[in-house]
Amino acid sequence: MVDRLVNSEVNSRRMANVEQCFGKMGEQLSVFGRVLVGEGVLVKMCRKKPKQRQFFLFNDILVYGNIVISKKRYNKQRILRLEGVQVEDLEDDGIEKHGWIIKTPAKSFAVYAATETEKREWMLHIERCVTDLLERGNKQAATAHAAVWVPDGEAVKCMVCGKTQFNLVQRRHHCRNCGRVVCGACSSRTFRIDNVHKKPVRVCDHCFDSLSSATPGQEESEPKTGNRLHHEDSSSDSEDEVNGSGRSSNESRPTFYREDVQQPAT
């Protein structure tokens, strides 16, 4: 089905519509050989809380953004190249159901669908697109993926020392190697993690020791008081929210345009 859609008029219209919804701030998505495979709303676990995001699956990239006006306007476009994407199932945990992890070299995060069927559809289509892309032979799979950040709300104390209570003075930080929420005293050093960022990024003391032992020769970086570290703990995902959070509605059920993937059993 995807091969038949390549450079078809209907596929071109779909991609042009996605570009129009992101406006001038989004990147050009209509390129030769690219196919829009599916689209829909997923709940992304952001640093502060879960929030709805619009996702578009192409045969070579996964695109998502903030919802400004449903099906009409999106912003803060993010593009993940599928050769670096890996999906991992998440077991249901209380109210957090129908979720999985999207792993990439630079950023990894959890997403949730409205139903188990939609979850399986998304995972099947993403895995199939990744497999097809790699089998074509001109892309290589990623060998390292970023850690999933522990949400702020799941840590009232530093997850390294277990003593520092977070408040307005004692801010939360995230280790870029393990994803834990840590205090400033337990994450004062930086280390270059090539798949995450070209410059040294904040890591906790435990990870700094293990990374230094595994990669001798890297110099320690001690930030001065008041200076911001590279990749500081800020997330545009938590800013300028328009539509609020919550699970996907029936109006935002995913639509997939390829018909050659076996549908999950209901």
UniProtKB/Swiss-Prot annotation:
<dbReference type="GO" id="GO:0008333">
    <property type="term" value="P:endosome to lysosome transport"/>
</dbReference>
<feature type="zinc finger region" description="FYVE-type">
    <location>
        <begin position="152"/>
        <end position="212"/>
    </location>
</feature>
<dbReference type="InterPro" id="IPR011011">
    <property type="entry name" value="Znf_FYVE_PHD"/>
</dbReference>
<dbReference type="Pfam" id="PF01363">
    <property type="entry name" value="FYVE"/>
</dbReference>
<feature type="binding site">
    <location>
        <position position="158"/>
    </location>
    <ligand>
        <name>Zn(2+) 1</name>
    </ligand>
</feature>
<dbReference type="InterPro" id="IPR013083">
    <property type="entry name" value="Znf_RING/FYVE/PHD"/>
</dbReference>
<dbReference type="InterPro" id="IPR037871">
    <property type="entry name" value="PH_Phafin"/>
</dbReference>
<dbReference type="InterPro" id="IPR011993">
    <property type="entry name" value="PH-like_dom_sf"/>
</dbReference>
<feature type="compositionally biased region" description="Basic and acidic residues">
    <location>
        <begin position="256"/>
        <end position="266"/>
    </location>
</feature>
<keyword id="KW-0862">Zinc</keyword>
<feature type="binding site">
    <location>
        <position position="207"/>
    </location>
    <ligand>
        <name>Zn(2+) 2</name>
    </ligand>
</feature>
<keyword id="KW-0863">Zinc-finger</keyword>
<feature type="binding site">
    <location>
        <position position="175"/>
    </location>
    <ligand>
        <name>Zn(2+) 2</name>
    </ligand>
</feature>
<feature type="domain" description="PH">
    <location>
        <begin position="35"/>
        <end position="131"/>
    </location>
</feature>
<dbReference type="Pfam" id="PF00169">
    <property type="entry name" value="PH"/>
</dbReference>
<dbReference type="InterPro" id="IPR017455">
    <property type="entry name" value="Znf_FYVE-rel"/>
</dbReference>
<dbReference type="GO" id="GO:0008270">
    <property type="term" value="F:zinc ion binding"/>
</dbReference>
<protein>
    <recommendedName>
        <fullName>Uncharacterized protein ZK632.12</fullName>
    </recommendedName>
</protein>
<dbReference type="GO" id="GO:0032266">
    <property type="term" value="F:phosphatidylinositol-3-phosphate binding"/>
</dbReference>
<dbReference type="GO" id="GO:0035091">
    <property type="term" value="F:phosphatidylinositol binding"/>
</dbReference>
<feature type="binding site">
    <location>
        <position position="178"/>
    </location>
    <ligand>
        <name>Zn(2+) 2</name>
    </ligand>
</feature>
<feature type="binding site">
    <location>
        <position position="186"/>
    </location>
    <ligand>
        <name>Zn(2+) 1</name>
    </ligand>
</feature>
<feature type="binding site">
    <location>
        <position position="161"/>
    </location>
    <ligand>
        <name>Zn(2+) 1</name>
    </ligand>
</feature>
<dbReference type="GO" id="GO:0007032">
    <property type="term" value="P:endosome organization"/>
</dbReference>
<dbReference type="InterPro" id="IPR000306">
    <property type="entry name" value="Znf_FYVE"/>
</dbReference>
<feature type="compositionally biased region" description="Basic and acidic residues">
    <location>
        <begin position="221"/>
        <end position="234"/>
    </location>
</feature>
<dbReference type="GO" id="GO:0005769">
    <property type="term" value="C:early endosome"/>
</dbReference>
<feature type="binding site">
    <location>
        <position position="183"/>
    </location>
    <ligand>
        <name>Zn(2+) 1</name>
    </ligand>
</feature>
<feature type="region of interest" description="Disordered">
    <location>
        <begin position="213"/>
        <end position="266"/>
    </location>
</feature>
<keyword id="KW-0479">Metal-binding</keyword>
<dbReference type="InterPro" id="IPR051765">
    <property type="entry name" value="PH_domain-containing_F"/>
</dbReference>
<feature type="binding site">
    <location>
        <position position="204"/>
    </location>
    <ligand>
        <name>Zn(2+) 2</name>
    </ligand>
</feature>
<dbReference type="InterPro" id="IPR001849">
    <property type="entry name" value="PH_domain"/>
</dbReference>
